[in-house]
Amino acid sequence: MHRRTLLLAAALSPAAAMAVSGSRAFATGRTFGFSPDGSQFVLDGAVFQIRSGEMHPARIPVPYWRHRIQMARAMGLNTIALYVMWNYLEERPGVFDLTTDRRDFAAFIRLCAQEGMYVLLRPGPYVCGEWDLGGLPSYLLKKPSIRLRVNSGQDPDYMAAVVRYVKAIAPVVRPLMAANGGPILMVQIENEYGSYGSDGTYLEQLRQLWLGAGVEGPFYTQDGLGQVVANHTNVTGGAIGLSGGTSSDIRACRTAYPRVPAMSGELYPGWLTHWGEGAFAGQDTDLSGALRDLMNARQSFNLYVVHGGTNFGYWAGANANDDGSGYTADITSYDYGAPITEQGRPAPRYTAYRSLIGSYPGVSLPPLPEPVPTITRTGSDAPIPSAYASLWDNLPAALPPAQTMAPQPMENYGQNSGFMLYRKVLPGYAGATLDVTSVHDYATVFLDGVYQGGISRPAVPSAYATPLKVTTGSRLALGSAGPRPTLDILVEGMGRTNFGHGLVDRKGITQQVSLSGAGPLNGTLSDWQTYALPVDEAFVAALRPKISQPGRAGVFFRATVTLAQTGDTYLDMSGWTKGAVWVNGHNLGRYWSIGPQQRLYCPAPWLTAGQNEILVLDLHQLRPQPIPFRASLVETPCTLTNRRSGKLLDVPDWSTASGAQLNQWSGNGGANQRWRRTTAADGICTLTNVHSGQLVDIQGNASTDGTPVIQWPANGGTNQQWRQVPTGDGYAKLVSVSTGKVLGVAGNATSDGAKIVEQTDTGDLSQQWLIASL
């Protein structure tokens, strides 16, 4: 499936003492459980409503952990839910890191206690969470026949790894449980298992594993209402949390399970976004009604997520159909449209939810913590990197030939993420079509160092694919070359599927490679040279500054930026094509021009007052572009007011239909009159409607006066790009990059409903617009 479906269920089991020794938040001797009839959670004998917000320490810079917890508490919440990502703690079999940087989840939990917040712990082993492989370690995929999320009888190797994981983290979890003076109210068993299977033996083995490690619960599970009812994927003595759970869903669950407590375990204030989608998802979600119902009924809930954070590095996940088709990779930002933005600021809905929750008796609203300052550098102050090193001049030794006869995925070589290079000399070459049966996930192809084109597993809009010669099929025509050219296929793994039955999603080339129409080379290719390229922090730290082939893509660009002071910022990569960025050695994550994300979050603690290094690896670009520093992920929504009529650029009748012609209308405060302006480094902008997520577009890319200006999904075309030309007093003309004509009102009319068209510039006031940020 392309998206994680809305599910419904989570189990919480009875009783445990609640206290935090040495913490200002709690005292010893507290008890937590639920009422005998399962209708309520109970703390110290009194009904207790869990008002939780989810955030993940792995996605938040450590210096900001306390700030984000305080933001959740100031919204009226009393609990933090968090995933523990197994693969982030154990990247190699048996080698655990529970203390370095964002991996120290126990320190995060202790901060929750210090801030007076309880905790719902969600340690998997599978978590989904739009995280690579749903948190399962990629080393599991080295076994060809691996079966994931099954009991020990079905795959003892999988379950043995789970046992090792639980035994490693249980000593950390145990003292933080309520019964032992910690803030953890409940521990979740697995995650949304009802959408994957119905193996009760597996769930019980997990429960017994925790019990055997001294963690006695309470436990809970998380599922969709339909799934938990159909597949009975709750656990003995546990409660049920419902994905997308409304007040009525909780009542329905308790009808199906009369003596089991239920809560809204994942209530979605936004949604996830994939590369290539027209706009950030979930921006218009309003949970006010659902929250009011839950508060009125004193039912427990968890906002997934109250703060999303960032998929730094290569940790973002993906979605795909069960057979692996329809693959879509998640963007780097995990802003999610959450009440607390990626950079920790209150989103527009934050204040509304805070006021709603705070209006109920017994809810206190602490003041918001101070926001982190931001810094910007634009125009001539924006850094412009210089070519620094070539990936091709920094190749490691090839892997042993015995292991590389046929192309194999990176997991077979113990590599978790990054890139793989597959190299083959082609004796007797006379032209051919390359057929790479299964690229996971994005390949650039070279013949004797000359770029031939690309192969992408994710769909790429034609406006981006055509100039780069990127195909989403498997076949790529190769050009002419000498009689023994070297074929290089560089493959980027973009994130493993994290939901559904297609979890076994290996990276690199996963099947055969062949040539057709090539005489003696016709057929399957073997005897490859293979290079493992994790391109991680250690790799970039050891780069040799050498570029022996300046015209060959795969260049690292470097800039040094001197800052008088630090602050949060976003690196605007809209002038670049596809790659990754490091700042002072920290991997900010992937960027890709197909969007919708164009800016990468750089937290202030990763910058220094003084000199800072920006390093960019771009898979296609040979000429560097400026990298402006911006204050936010996206521009603040704006309105466009026509100078002659005083009316606003408007999508009529709140239409979401592609092709709807725009008009002008009196201001109504609606999202159909609000636009997100994304401005590239060269001053060219696009305008995306906040309501529909579609862009201002010249119909059919026609250049005739009077051509309708419509809304249309993002396609990268120049007919969706506009130059802003100031005309004085804050007004500007919007000039089409494609046609050179301007955005105007048909007939220079001033009436509501007058159509928006392209026109030759006449200087009329109806061709001028005031762009005002909200």
What residue spans do the PLM features occupy?
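N-terminal export signals
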Residues: 5-25
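N-terminal carbohydrate-binding accessory modules
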Residues: 26-79
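Aromatic-lined substrate-binding rim segments of carbohydrate-active enzymes
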Residues: 67-74, 81-130
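Aromatic- and acidic-residue-enriched segments that line the glycan-binding/catalytic groove
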Residues: 94-100, 125-150, 317-329
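Active-site neighborhood of glycoside hydrolase catalytic domains
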Residues: 161-229
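Catalytic-core region of carbohydrate-active enzymes that cleave or remodel glycosidic bonds
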Residues: 245-331, 337
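Aromatic-lined ligand-binding clefts that engage carbohydrates, nucleic acids, or primary amines
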Residues: 432-449, 487, 561-584, 591-592, ...
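Lectin-like carbohydrate-binding module/patch detector with strong preference for beta-trefoil
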Residues: 635-774
